[in-house]
Design a protein with these regions (language model features):
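Serine-dependent carboxylesterase/thioesterase catalytic core
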Residues: 1-6, 10-11, 15, 20-21, ...
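C-terminal catalytic-base region of ester-bond hydrolases, centering on the histidine
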Residues: 134-207
Length: 207
């Protein structure tokens, strides 16, 4: 299952969907209101989709894998806190996903204090917020390191132009991969899909 990021739609994940399908996967490319409404609406939608899988005669041999890009990572984590969806998801792969807050968010919020009142999903990006997935879920993290754009000078040495390496690190990850791609391209390359395939099938990104 593909989960897009902030201010995007399922169309932004279209290339990854096509690439994974070429590699033999059955892919659900989901769409969420991740621009203006509170993220709780998206959490309810993802929860409903997972429960439909659980009670819809899911083959036990089929793995359920959630792939979250950008803010989609926080949407996954918040949804999986719900006890009703425990045990459904086998693996989570996070792509350039800020797990708590981000430098860009903090700086823009200083300049525009009403930012989170307009773009309500951004409220989940807080310096002291937690990010924790169930220990039974295998987690892989992919982080871009090809810097570009006007914000890159704020972000430190390793960044993809939108988020930096530290913002995406998850201590509970089984594997973390850095690849030299920018934020807006990292999820669209066949190479990224092949790394995802490796992690799903072998538990490591590079083989």
């Amino acid at each position: 299952m593909l989960i897009h990021g902030f201010n995007k739609s399922y169309r932004d994940m279209g290339a990854l969907q096509e690439n994974l399908e070429l590699l033999g996967y059955r892919v659900e490319n989901l769409n969420f209101p991740l621009t203006f409404p509170d993220i709780k609406f998206s959490e309810s939608m993802l929860k409903e989709f997972l429960l439909d899988l659980k009670y819809g005669g899911l083959n036990e041999k089929e793995e359920i894998i959630l792939i979250g890009y950008g803010l989609g990572g926080k949407l996954i984590e918040r949804t999986l806190r719900d006890e009703e969806v425990k045990g459904i998801v086998d693996k989570v792969i996070l792509i350039s996903a800020p797990l708590r807050d981000s430098v860009i968010h903090r700086r823009l919020k200083r300049a525009f204090p009403i930012l989170d009142n307009i773009f309500k999903p951004l409220r989940v990006l807080k310096k002291n917020s937690t990010f924790k997935l169930d220990d039974n879920i295998e987690v892989g993290v992919i982080i871009g390191t090809e810097t570009c754009g006007i914000f890159s000078r704020w972000l430190g040495e390793f960044n993809d132009g939108i988020v930096n390496y530290k913002e995406c690190l998850y201590e509970g990850a089984k594997e973390t991969l850095k690849i030299p791609l920018v934020h807006n391209e990292i999820h669209k390359k066949m190479g990224t899909a092949k790394y995802i395939n490796n992690f799903i099938s072998k538990g490591v990104f590079r083989t």
